[in-house]
Amino acid sequence: MASGIARGRLAEERKSWRKNHPHGFVAKPETGQDGTVNLMVWHCTIPGKAGTDWEGGFFPLTMHFSEDYPSKPPKCKFPQGFFHPNVYPSGTVCLSILNEDYGWRPAITVKQILVGIQDLLDTPNPADPAQTDGYHLFCQDPVEYKKRVKLQSKQYPALV
């Protein structure tokens, strides 16, 4: 029964996204070689916000939904080794709205999650670090931190 709820909600999310989504963002369910759509895994792209050190980057993110969605949040992952204070070395994003014990609410949409992650890129939360490297540079060497962010943004150009 729960999987029916999850898939139904994700089908609605997909329909809503296709009608209206923020410029530069991509979010689509995984499609198999045979054309089947897997609503439980979405491949997304988050653009770096204009006017920030992240501008120009288009960052790939995968959202993994469980059968308990929307009671439980999706797991959101950048590529392994992604540089950011609130991204674990595995690529998993550490954000309050993705924490089922803290900020998650079933009403939160895919669009809200992706925009929240875009905001997090330029405004890290030093109170909730997930990787030592990004955290230390952000806190102790802002010039080097900005350099690393700009370099990473160049590593993820637009795919057009």
UniProtKB/Swiss-Prot annotation:
The keyword ATP-binding applies. One of its GO terms (molecular function) is kinase binding. GO terms for cellular component: cytosol; nucleus. InterPro entries: Ub_conjugating_enzyme, UBQ-conjugat_E2_core, UBQ-conjugating_AS, UBQ-conjugating_enzyme/RWD. Belongs to the ubiquitin-conjugating enzyme family. Interacts with SIZ1 (via PHD domain) and MMS21. Interacts with TCP14 and TCP15. Interacts with KIN10. PANTHER family: UBIQUITIN-CONJUGATING ENZYME E2 (PTHR24067). This is SUMO-conjugating enzyme SCE1.
